[in-house]
Amino acid sequence: MKPDYLIVGSGLSALVFGALMAKAEKKVHIIEAHEFPGGFGHTFTYGKHYKFNAQLHYVWGCGQGQSVNRILKHLNLDQEVTFEQYDPDGYDHMKMPGYSLEITGDSQLLISRLSQLFPKHTRNIKHFILEVEKISTAFDSFSKAGINLDLFKLPQAALGIFKYLKCTLQDVFDQFGLPKEAQTLLALQWPDFLLPPNQLSFHAWVLLFTGYQKGAFYPTRHFEHVINSLVEVIEKNNGKIIYNQEAVDFVVDKKTVTSVIIKDLINGQDYEYSGENIICNMDPKKAADMIGTDKLSNSIQKKLNYEYSASNFMAYCAVKDIDLKKYGFGKWNVFHTGSIDLNETFKTMYHKHDYSNPSFAICTPGFLTKEASEIPEGQHIIEFLTVADYDYFKKLKETDTSAYKKKKKEILNSMIDIVEQNYIPDFRKHLAFKITGSPTTNERFCWCPQGNSYGSILTPKNINIGRLNHKTSLKNMYFCNASSGFAGFAGTFWTGAKLYQKLSGDRII
């Protein structure tokens, strides 16, 4: 008997959609190319003692009554899957030469802190922060208006969204006349987008910046527990996930997708899976290439013409015999830059592959929870994240493996040098474990084209009302992916839940 929903891929949006449908007594089958579920949200084990999440660090939308919380409540998971909040008085600590700023959820306090740093620009700072707050409120109104929007019935505040539809963050910084240093402090969480201010959609920045202002969180029992809990809902409701199954083709009869051809990565055999509905969690462009773009409508073909987001460089580390609290670490992230010009810094790292003065994020999740520690007792996880060019690393790996390894070591050493100079003297003496991941690592383990981290690039061109959504123009097939919804933890939860609402008529967010 065919399942009601055959889902291709087990990324976070697919698991949310699958869990909601399974809970609604629909038969759900998921085929996954990897050996673990979760996509970028999966947790990997290295050796006997170390566990790291591939890409997730801190998340938003998890507070009482917020979107993730409402979805978990609908699944009866809100008491099982809980979250610890980062310090609301300063969940992101921004560091640059001569300045530091603790980002707070209180906009008035944020205005005060910035004004103390830049007293001559108090008026401009206030106007900018209040405008960000207003646009955030407009997004809430826009979302509450539902799926079928009537622009003439939207609250007046929501119409303010359209003013900045084509703007980058840099455009709006310039409109409000913020000093360069203030711009850098406010945009220093750029690794959350892997874009600098002069390319990043202002709307994308507002959604994430204010999302974290409303509460930055880390799962009490780590991200692995979140993924496993969603899987458990699916399996307890007669659903299943079949691993090591790579989708290689879609069978289309006229305008209807009837089945998916997969390659079993264990035995090398091809199999055919069918379902009453096909949910495509894999990259939409990749799926369209398999189907044949000529079979899709002109409108969908146009929406599929997106660039991928940049990729990243990750260093997963553990330290011992040190109290990180004494060195300024705690229930917050640290974002560092050695230059006040993030646009130029990004260009230098991403296009010139020069990491001599990098900007990067430092995450210490161990301060948020002591539950089921993922490292040996007495050690602390510390992770470093920055941007990296997929084409550059792919070419290095294919042509000169030693040069590829040397470049990864060079980037890590550059970041550690900065950590020792600015934050933790003798950091290397306390380093108990380290492993790095490059864009090709992302591609190999998460099956993401060009090692992309967020699906389509988060520029104004892609963050607009013409953005790709669940529609494929084919019968019985729907997209459910970061590129057809939104990226990140809260974004993919939202994407899966929105598709569930569309197909079930059961509104939960």
Go through each PLM region and give its residues.
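Rossmann-like flavin
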Residues: 97-200
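Mid-domain catalytic core of redox enzymes
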Residues: 248-376
